[in-house]
Design a protein with these regions (language model features):
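Histidine-acidic metal/acid-base catalytic patches
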Residues: 1-5, 13-30, 58, 62, ...
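Short amphipathic alpha-helical segments at helix-loop
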Residues: 4, 11, 42, 100-104, ...
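Short, flexible active-site loop motifs that bind/organize anionic cofactors or intermediates
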Residues: 6-9, 44-47, 102, 136, ...
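Active-site beta-loop-alpha junctions enriched in small/polar residues
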Residues: 7-11, 34-38, 73-76, 104-107, ...
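Glycine-rich, proline-tolerant flexible connector loops at the mouths of alpha/beta enzymes
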Residues: 32-56
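Alpha-helix N-cap and loop-to-helix initiation/capping positions
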Residues: 45-53, 80-87, 107-114, 138-141, ...
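Active-site acidic/histidine proton-transfer and metal-coordination neighborhood
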Residues: 60-67, 75-159, 169
C-alpha cells in the first residue's frame, strides 16, 4: 500500500515538529503540513528553510520514517503577491514535499490564470507540483471549474485536487471523475459524510470540523477510488470535532481510511 498521508486539517491543533511524532505514533508514514493559512488570520505553522524548527522537524522525520507529502495552503486572492510564497516553497522543498494545495479566492479569471501560472514557475525549481482544490463556497467551486483553470494555465506542474466531500457537495459525481483525463488528477483527499448536504449555512462548518470517518457515511468512496489512477497520492482529511484528543483522532482516521484502501486493493 502507498503511504497514506495525514492531512494537517485532521489535526490542525498540532504543529511541527510534534506533528511528525503524532503522525508516526498514530501509524502514518506521511503527513501534509500547513505552512500558510487559507484565510487571513487562520491557523498555520510557518517554517523557514534552515531554521531550528525545520531542522527539528527533519530530524523527527528521519527518526520515525515519516515523509512530508505536501504543503498547504497557497491562497490566490485579489491581493496575492507571488513572491510571498517563495519562503514556503523553499521550506517545502527542504522538507521533501512534492505537492502544494492551492485555494482560489479570486473571481477575476484572467488574474487567477496569470497568478497561478506565475506560482507554477516559482514552484518548478523546487520540484513542487500545484494541486488546485475546488470548494462550493469559493469561485472555483466545482470539479469542472478546477479542470478548466488547470487546462488554461497549461503548465506541466499544475493539477486538480479531488476532495471527496467537496466533490459531492458541489454536485459532482463519480462519473465526472471517470470522464477526466487521469493525467489531470494530482492528489485526492478522503473522508466520509451523509449523502444529503447540510443547509448552505452549514457547508463550511461540515468541511472544516464535522466530517465522518471513511465507512461511517454514505459517500461513494469505493466507487471514487475505482475511478482514480492507481498511483494517485491519497491523504486522509477528516477533521472530527467530536474527538478532542488529537492522537485518538489521528488513529481513528488512519484505521478507517486504511480499511477502505485495503478493500479496494
Amino acid at each position: 500500500m502507498k503511504r497514506l498521508s495525514l492531512s494537517h486539517l485532521t489535526v490542525l491543533d498540532v504543529g511541527p515538529p510534534h506533528l511528525i511524532t503524532l503522525a508516526a505514533e498514530a501509524g502514518f508514514r506521511a503527513v501534509g503540513i500547513r505552512l500558510c493559512s487559507p484565510m487571513p488570520g487562520g491557523v498555520a505553522y510557518p517554517l523557514r528553510a534552515g531554521s531550528p524548527a525545520l531542522r527539528d522537524t527533519r530530524r523527527l522525520m528521519n527518526a520515525h520514517d515519516v515523509v512530508v507529502s505536501d504543503i498547504e495552503v497557497v491562497r490566490i486572492a485579489a491581493d496575492t503577491r507571488i513572491d510571498d510564497y517563495a519562503d514556503a516553497f523553499e521550506a517545502g522543498a527542504e522538507l521533501g514535499a512534492r505537492r502544494v494545495c492551492i485555494n482560489i479566492d479570486d473571481s477575476e479569471r484572467a488574474r487567477v490564470i496569470d497568478r497561478l501560472g506565475a506560482l507554477c514557475d516559482l514552484a518548478a525549481p523546487f520540484g513542487l507540483a500545484l494541486d488546485v482544490e475546488f470548494m462550493v463556497w469559493r469561485p472555483v467551486a466545482r470539479l469542472e471549474d478546477a479542470v478548466s483553470v488547470v487546462k488554461e494555465v497549461h503548465k506541466p506542474n499544475v493539477f486538480v485536487l479531488i476532495d471527496a466531500l467537496h466533490l459531492m457537495r458541489s454536485g459532482g459525481t463519480v462519473a465526472s471523475v471517470e470522464a477526466l483525463d487521469p493525467a489531470l488528477i494530482g492528489s485526492v483527499q478522503l473522508c466520509d459524510a451523509p449523502l444529503a448536504s447540510p443547509p448552505p449555512s452549514g457547508i463550511v462548518d461540515e468541511a472544516r470540523g464535522n466530517r465522518l470517518l471513511p465507512g461511517e457515511g454514505e459517500l461513494p468512496l469505493r466507487e471514487l477510488l475505482d475511478a482514480l489512477p492507481k498511483d494517485v497520492p491519497i491523504s486522509a482529511e477528516v477533521p472530527l470535532a467530536r474527538e478532542t484528543d488529537c492522537m485518538m483522532r489521528a488513529s481513528l482516521v488512519r484505521q478507517a481510511t486504511e480499511r477502505l484502501l485495503r478493500e479496494r486493493a
